[in-house]
Amino acid sequence: NGAYLTLIERKTRFYYMIPISAKSSKQVYMQINKLHKFYGDSFKDIFKSITFDNGSEFSRWKDIEQKPKSKEKRTTVYFGRPYHSCDRASNENCNGLIRYFIKKGTDINTIDKETTIDINNKINQKKRKILGYLSSEELFLNELAKLNVTDNTIFYKI
């Protein structure tokens, strides 16, 4: 049925909504590697840590913590406590926003790339009180500029 791998950057609350063809550890690992390849050495600064829920699709967490070839540490993986969605509240909130656009139970594999990008952009462009009425996108682009990352077309390359 496919699914979305969703990640949220902690400082700016920039949201990643990455389609995966199956809810599997292999798919999650492959998509994290694509993100790492896209951001290069800046990956470790953007994703200092990742908090997953306890689904089996995150069973390759040790592999995710390391760069694929060098096995150098690239991030730290944490797990939320079972049945404590508050451990990942920002992510869960954004996951709820997806439901405005896609009904629960919809096969993600039937949703085209442009629709996914559009939904993701709408979530990231939403002004938020917690961010001083700025959007996640505005703040994230500022952070990328500090890291000298000028290309933010990741969603077009997934």
Residue ranges of each PLM-predicted region?
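RNase H-like two-metal-ion nuclease catalytic core shared by retroviral integrases
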Residues: F52-N54, W61, P68, T76-I102, ...
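Active/binding-pocket-proximal capping segment
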Residues: K23-S24, K34-L35, N54, Q66-E72
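Active-site beta-loop-alpha junctions of metal-dependent nucleic acid enzymes
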Residues: M17-S42
